[in-house]
Amino acid sequence: AAELKNTLGLAGDEAGGLAMIAQTTGRSIDDVTASIVDTTSAFNSANRSAISQGQIIRDVAKASDGVKASLGGNDVAIAKAATAARRLGMELSQVDSIASSLMDFESSIEAELEAQLLTGKNINMSKARELALNNDLAGLGKELFKNSASLAEFGKMNRIQKEAQAKALGMTRDQLGKI
């Protein structure tokens, strides 16, 4: 763990988290780190993004026990979810919270219908709810990105429309504004 702190600039708890993932998967820390870097690079290439590999290593290392358990302790799955979260301008824990809010089906569907009525935009969150139900946080991140308003659209909305759009996505207005 001390080597990770020096080499990757990780905090003590982050280095410990990465070491635990390596131990759980039966792989070396170097293998785990390399797979996280490869996963981030592949995501960046596929999505024309520039998400920091170091940030994703830190995000994977500090993923909550609940997220790790939901994703089977798989470093690649956690890295995919973390990159999808960062693409949204969020941390993995925030996407996990959104997944939880989408599981309140009645409220989620009500918010979706309200947003459609107020914005005139077709919003379909059924796939997002399915992904949340199946603990697919990477897929959920992509689905949230797909259903978010573009910056131009978001800028034209009034405050009530912005709040409704964000609520339908399980987010706050500020979170939606970051996308």
Predicted features, each with a name:
Residues 1-178:
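Amphipathic alpha-helical assembly segments
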